[in-house]
Amino acid sequence: MRHDLHAIFNGCLYIAREGCCWRSLPKVICPPWTVVFWHFQRWSKSALLVQVTHALNEAVRRKKGREMTPSTLIVDAHSLKSRNGGEAIGFDGNKKVHGRKNQVLIDTLGLIWDVHTHAANLSDNYEAVPLFDHFLPLLPRAKQVYFDKGYRGTAVSYLTDLDVASHISDKGVGEKKGGFQPEPLRWRVERTIAWITDCRRLKASFERTISSCEGFAWLTGCYIARGKLVGRKPWAMSKVSVI
């Protein structure tokens, strides 16, 4: 029996957004969960979700009158508690989280351009390097990267060798006595991480494999970019069929 790929993709988005288990997919609007799960595994292990997200990102940038690829990028990480164990699990002593970290690379519009998942006990400074290896061939216009003090050292040296400028923001610098002042550009990646964790499947790591964990992050990237294309706020609730 053949199933509609549109319905299968929406089934994956439903899981990412609602955070339910695979067997709880509503049968009325989605194909059997085994079909949706099989396709999700296949797409996660290939570059398909990455390609779809990048294509949507480029469409958003064209709509806003920007170049197709960004010149300014922002990096940050968010930790996920592991619920089921599996690959690459560690303890983040800083945030007191046992699980994984997602290194996220975005542009100034908040669109996701790369994701790298690793054990939470590994240093951001070293684990950001795979991001740079991935994005530089895909984003030839990249000229500068913003990140916080946790990336000072190896990450900065690596970018310097590639002739990409590094900007490290120091918390507390430039703050006024009147109250909190957001750090220039850095607040955008915090906003994107808030959008990511608004998808319940990414509030914690329920996946046993790295490919599945990154797959849900890329699905969220599709969700954010598609929402910007149709004029929907990324944090707004929507129907299941969003693409």
Residue ranges of each PLM-predicted region?
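Short alpha-helical elements
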Residues: 1-243
